UniProtKB/Swiss-Prot annotation:
<comment type="similarity">
    <text>Belongs to the cytochrome P450 family.</text>
</comment>
<keyword id="KW-0349">Heme</keyword>
<dbReference type="InterPro" id="IPR036396">
    <property type="entry name" value="Cyt_P450_sf"/>
</dbReference>
<keyword id="KW-0503">Monooxygenase</keyword>
<keyword id="KW-0408">Iron</keyword>
<dbReference type="GO" id="GO:0005506">
    <property type="term" value="F:iron ion binding"/>
</dbReference>
<dbReference type="GO" id="GO:0020037">
    <property type="term" value="F:heme binding"/>
</dbReference>
<feature type="transmembrane region" description="Helical">
    <location>
        <begin position="30"/>
        <end position="50"/>
    </location>
</feature>
<keyword id="KW-0472">Membrane</keyword>
<comment type="function">
    <text>Cytochrome P450 monooxygenase; part of the gene cluster that mediates the biosynthesis of sordarin and hypoxysordarin, glycoside antibiotics with a unique tetracyclic diterpene aglycone structure. First, the geranylgeranyl diphosphate synthase sdnC constructs GGDP from farnesyl diphosphate and isopentenyl diphosphate. The diterpene cyclase sdnA then catalyzes the cyclization of GGDP to afford cycloaraneosene.</text>
</comment>
<dbReference type="InterPro" id="IPR001128">
    <property type="entry name" value="Cyt_P450"/>
</dbReference>
<dbReference type="GO" id="GO:0017000">
    <property type="term" value="P:antibiotic biosynthetic process"/>
</dbReference>
<dbReference type="GO" id="GO:0016705">
    <property type="term" value="F:oxidoreductase activity, acting on paired donors, with incorporation or reduction of molecular oxygen"/>
</dbReference>
<dbReference type="GO" id="GO:0004497">
    <property type="term" value="F:monooxygenase activity"/>
</dbReference>
<keyword id="KW-0812">Transmembrane</keyword>
<dbReference type="Pfam" id="PF00067">
    <property type="entry name" value="p450"/>
</dbReference>
<keyword id="KW-0045">Antibiotic biosynthesis</keyword>
Amino acid sequence: MEVHNATSFLGHGGMAQHLQPVLESPFAESILALTPLQGIALFLCLFWGYSSLTLHRRIKVPGAPVHGYWSWLEPTWLLQLRYAKDAHKIIASGYKRYNVNGKPFVLRRQDLDITVLPTKYVAELRTIPNAKLSRGKANFMEWGDQWAMKNLWSHIDLPIKVISENRHGQQGKYLEAMRKEFEHAMEVEMPQVDDWTAVDIQKIIQMILARMVGKMIVGKEACRSPEWLDLAEHFTEDFVGASIIMRMLPKWTHPLVTNLLPQRWRMRRRLRDAVNITNPCVTRHREAREKRAKGIEVDYEDNMVGWMLDNAPDKQYVLDHLPILILIILVPAAHTTAMGISNLLFHLCEYPEWGAKLLKEINDVNNEFGPIGERLPAKDWVTKLDLLDSFFNESQRLSQPLSITPNRYAVEDFTFKDGLHIPKGALLGWVSIHNQIDPKIAPDPDTFDPLRSYRKRQVSAEENAKHLAGQPSLENLTFGYGSQACPGRNIAITVLKMILSRILRDYEFKFGDGQARPQNIYLLEFIIPDPKAKLMVRKREASVS
């Protein structure tokens, strides 16, 4: 058998001559003599050694200890490894040990540190401008960084404005457009079955939302195209998957790893393909504007692409970055809403006695005000569903998508009113699962109580306007808090109730024989429903044609 050494693979040219002294050095000979197992061990030692050296560069908030060590003997690299699967427990115990007593603590991830502040500081977020504590920059750090999100992110605030702006009633227009598309989505996506059938309900809800949200963002023609449906179904999966991987790696590895991830390859490809969606949208919008300017009626519904083109201070920037901008809107709009609906259905199957109560409320509202959108616009119709609102609040309390939210990035040095100093560059977060573990926030927190919010609203007229789904409060941080709370929360809650009021009226759901509520998956700060979970579904007898 022919034997090769390192130099035989370099040829006999100049490169081999230059490298010959290096390859023949005692150090190189020692490296080349290592077994594969020894080589892996050496690599890991160098990897974690360099990672440890970079820890001193992390921004430190005075008085905030690192939490999560088993003991003082545990090395930091082991804590960082454990954090991937134990984050939920570490966050909960840190809240009880420090936050309850008014003190901050630090979560030490592989890529960065998060300083977790007590809930008392949340109230100040209302008055702190984005220029000091930024949600946008925090999201950029959490969902990647300049390497992970290169060419896949835009710091322009136009996607936030297009969702939150309502000067000309465009939110109502968007909801009406989505309501119409919902009818088509139900016909295409929901199974028309009279007998109990096992279905992937999460996938079904995801695709219904992909069509509805697509109608709002890119319009009717685009939202039904195979290109859009593929983008909506798979881009978010790769986006979240890439983010999870990057969070589990030291930041110094990101420039190397970002180009090796298959998720990143697929994201880039779909971003290029998105041009085939946005270019026709731009053309249709331009043609509709020209005809309207001439007084010609056109069959064209306003959408978010058109709003951005009409209202952007730099139209050319929008044209150049439109695929990125629509994806920034799509990812949170469809993904988290689908999770919320799926979790509610899981809870309803776990507590089936509530099915008849929710159905009665839906039928009563339907009988009094007609079908949604007929006599009342969607945003007003769904406000009549008080019991469904409270049921969703409780379901979301126990199945939130993230255990740390809101987040803020310190753009500059900042000091809270009580003197807590936050240095520039610090990443801040709050424990959003506090209402799962703190009896002072939610009495008997382990109990599923669908009337928890409903009872609070009955106390007084003032309280009746509070404790609503999607309404940020010190007790409910799921949608953030303050002036930078989730801008699309009202649209999301309206769409969620729109979908649930229809499918609960038309369909029955239950677990399969021997099946219980699927367990959530905890990974880093993410709380994810079991993607393999299925439900049994059939059309209600009154709905069977």
